[in-house]
Amino acid sequence: MPLSKEQKQEVMEKYKLHEHDTGSPEVQIAILTEKIKQLNEHLKTHQQDHASRRGLLKMVGKRRGLLNYLKSNSADRYLELIKKLGLRK
């Protein structure tokens, strides 16, 4: 269930800061958000898939850490990103 190359490229195009940007916090957070959305859909139909649920929790924790990093280094970029992604503070 990983993101396809096309999906990942689409997310990178949308959130990149410069032409060859693949590793900025914004891009990483956006990719994790897409993975989390996909995994949430999977878990709606496969409630007993505990391994995937654990992976989901790890991804959410990693995204939270990246969001905290972005918030401490650039609050305006943080606020803009959570608004774009529709995340809660």
Swiss-Prot record:
CDD domains xrefs: Ribosomal_S15p_S13e
Keyword rRNA-binding on entry: yes
Single GO term (MF): rRNA binding
Start and end residues of each stretch annotated as Disordered: 1-22
One Pfam family named in its UniProt record: Ribosomal_S15
Entry's Gene Ontology BP terms: translation
CC terms in the record's Gene Ontology section: cytosolic small ribosomal subunit
SMART domains: Ribosomal_S15
Annotated keywords: Ribonucleoprotein, Ribosomal protein, RNA-binding, rRNA-binding
Function recorded in the entry: One of the primary rRNA binding proteins, it binds directly to 16S rRNA where it helps nucleate assembly of the platform of the 30S subunit by binding and bridging several RNA helices of the 16S rRNA.
Sequence similarity: Belongs to the universal ribosomal protein uS15 family.
Subunit structure: Part of the 30S ribosomal subunit. Forms a bridge to the 50S subunit in the 70S ribosome, contacting the 23S rRNA.
Name of protein: Small ribosomal subunit protein uS15
Provenance organism: Natranaerobius thermophilus (strain ATCC BAA-1301 / DSM 18059 / JW/NM-WN-LF)
Gene name of the record: rpsO
